[in-house]
Design a protein with these regions (language model features):
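NAD(P)+-binding Rossmann beta1-loop-alpha1 motif at the extreme N-terminus of oxidoreductases
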Residues: 2-70, 77, 207-208, 298
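NAD(P)-dependent Rossmann-like dehydrogenase/reductase catalytic/cofactor-binding core
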Residues: 2-8, 12-14, 221-300
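Rossmann-like NAD(P)(H) cofactor-binding subdomain of soluble oxidoreductases
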Residues: 48, 54-55, 64, 72-149, ...
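Internal alpha-helical scaffold of NAD(P)-dependent oxidoreductase catalytic cores
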Residues: 48, 120-130, 146-184, 196-233, ...
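Short acidic-hydrophobic, aromatic-tinged amphipathic segments that line or gate anion-handling sites
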Residues: 67-72, 174-176
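Short pre-catalytic strand/loop immediately N-terminal to key active-site residues, enriched for Gly-Thr
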Residues: 132, 181-186, 238-243
Length: 300
């Protein structure tokens, strides 16, 4: 399995003299900005952010040392690249605001709006701006994020490379076909939630057999971290790595038997399946999810 990609030459994030804008200065917006600034991919005076919540603007500006404003429209024409980090339901209003603010045709838009495809974004914008869609996850906060990206009909490979450079500032980034985005959202986008629940349950189990809670949490978290690194660094299948620690009549095989009795594989598979169905409807507002749900054609 390949390691985290490294560019031999830095990929320019914005053109000379232009700026990078971030609309939505919440957790993920601030995380991406922090990664770009700390990685020196862009200077503080070349970045601005906007958020409809004044208190969020104040907090983000203080944390990052950049301009963060509720009324950001005047800055839009100077932007060479804009990151969209708002909620999916805010997409129509934000796209209209960008268009009315004088968005330049060549400005690249990178969206992390879950469930909103590139076709939908392009339709809302009503222009031929290049659009890249991304799905990061929350471990980006500690520089260990997993992001997938794809490009819309007007975006180029160079646009995709610029997006990849941004998300590699906070972890790993892989280009994929857009048809996989609902499944990716369910697996890696929601994945930290599954992992935290599993870690919590294992820590509780440690307490049940007599361990102090903090010790149990540390043992579980470090074991999860080390196991993940073994998979990524060795390229070996998890089943082969599991066999290495499973000795005849030992503790591990006994514990695994109980997990299999509890149908852990099918429970996890059903969780991802259900989350995939929900992802398909995130960009269209509240709706009843059909039994046949899930799956989205490329660009929906």
């Amino acid at each position: 399995m390949s390691k985290k990609p490294e560019h031999t030459q830095p990929v320019p994030v914005v053109a000379e003299g232009a700026t990078l804008g971030v609309i939505g200065a919440g957790v993920m917006g601030q995380t991406l900005l922090r990664g770009l600034l700390s990685g020196k991919l862009i200077a503080h005076d070349r970045v601005w952010a906007g958020d409809k919540n004044p208190s969020t603007c104040d907090a983000a500006s203080e944390a990052l040392g950049i301009a963060v404003e509720s009324d950001y429209q005047a800055r839009v024409p100077s932007a060479d690249l804009i990151l969209l980090c708002v909620k999916p339901n805010d997409a129509p209003a934000v796209m209209a605001a960008l268009r009315n603010a004088g968005l330049r045709r060549e400005t690249l838009l990178i969206s992390i709006l879950a469930g909103v495809g590139t076709d939908r974004l392009e339709s809302l914008l009503g222009t031929e701006n290049p659009v890249v869609r991304a799905m990061p996850n929350t471990p980006a906060v500690v520089g260990e994020g997993m992001t997938v990206i794809c490009r819309g009909r007007y975006a180029t490979k160079a646009d995709l490379q610029r997006a990849q450079a941004i998300f590699e500032a906070v972890g790993r980034c892989i280009p994929v076909d857009e048809v996989h985005f609902n499944a990716v959202t369910a697996l890696s986008g929601s994945g930290p939630g599954y992992q935290f629940l599993i870690m919590e349950a294992l820590a509780d189990a440690g307490v049940r057999v007599g361990l102090p809670r903090q010790l149990a949490l540390t043992l579980v978290a470090q074991t999860a971290l080390g196991s993940a690194r073994m998979v990524l660094s060795t390229g070996r299948h998890p089943a082969a790595l599991r066999d290495d620690v499973t000795t005849p009549a030992g503790c591990t095989i006994g514990g695994l038997l109980m997990l299999e009795d509890g149908r852990i594989r099918s429970v996890l598979a059903r969780a991802v399946e259900e989350a995939t169905k929900i992802s398909a409807h995130l960009g269209v507002g509240p709706t009843k999810i059909s039994e046949s749900g899930g799956g989205q054609r490329s660009g929906d």
